Amino acid sequence: MPSIKEKTLHLILRRIAPRLVDLLGHSIQFRFVNTEYPQERAWRGESCIFCFWHNRFLLMPYFYQRVRGKKNICVMASRSRDGEYISDVLKGFGFRVARGSSSRGGDVAVKEMVSLLKSGLDAAVTPDGPRGPRYRVQPGVVLLSQLSAVPIVPVTYDVKGKGRLRSWDRFIVPMPFCRGICMFGEPVWIDGSADEEERKRMRSRLESDMRAMDARAASLLGATPD
């Protein structure tokens, strides 16, 4: 049975953390780039699989609501304690959560997300999470796209002022009241008949696309890419 301390923490994460994330996002002067495709699919009621690096997770709920204008999304979170905390925050935004990762429960989470994608919900995945290596796309997101026949839409952001945690991914913590870029990439479709070699090729392409987006976002800000 959860202790009073644990119950209090879960309550804070669900009710207060989402408001703080929204406040942080609104305080930053963001320029949004290439939002047309995800917005058009939203107007048509079509799903997307949003794909972003683990260290850029913090503001993604804010960006999603700004660009898609809804809360119909399922986010994959690991079965670790950290994943439980992240789940609380996501549920506070009104999002659904599928618990699983490359190391624990991934197959179950993928099946759940495929079903939800086919029913019209969006999905969100960190392809290098939950343990890395940083900026390396793991197989799950490509398989998810293939099984659901829904395109992957890569997303990144960068800000002029930021701190970083001493974690494996060097998690980005944006500073308020600075300038930022939020960028959406071109959709990546995975053919339903793709074999293992083709899936590997598409993983490599997605990884290259996402790193190029990171560099471009940094360049537009006049910052140094990591």
Predicted region positions:
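Short amphipathic alpha-helical segments and helix-helix/interface helices
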Residues: 38-39, 87, 141-142
